[in-house]
């Protein structure tokens, strides 16, 4: 196995945010991308510079906004939603990797 991709939605303020997270074979984040952002504000979470801070994270990593993850002024709900979604995806991928190895 080379890696995994995880596609999901999180709820923004009023609309879903569709995102993808890419993992290596050990469950570490290799990249992430906002596929579709539907809210009128807060679209800065689609910026690849912001998304790059998830690189190398796993389910064991810290995801505290303001220290581990940069906040974005005016995009608090979107930042929280995407961060929670990516963190959740790391748990799902870890579970899948454990199941594969059993």
Regions found by a protein language model. Name each.
Residues 1-80, 84-102:
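Flexible, solvent-exposed loop/hinge segments and secondary-structure transition points
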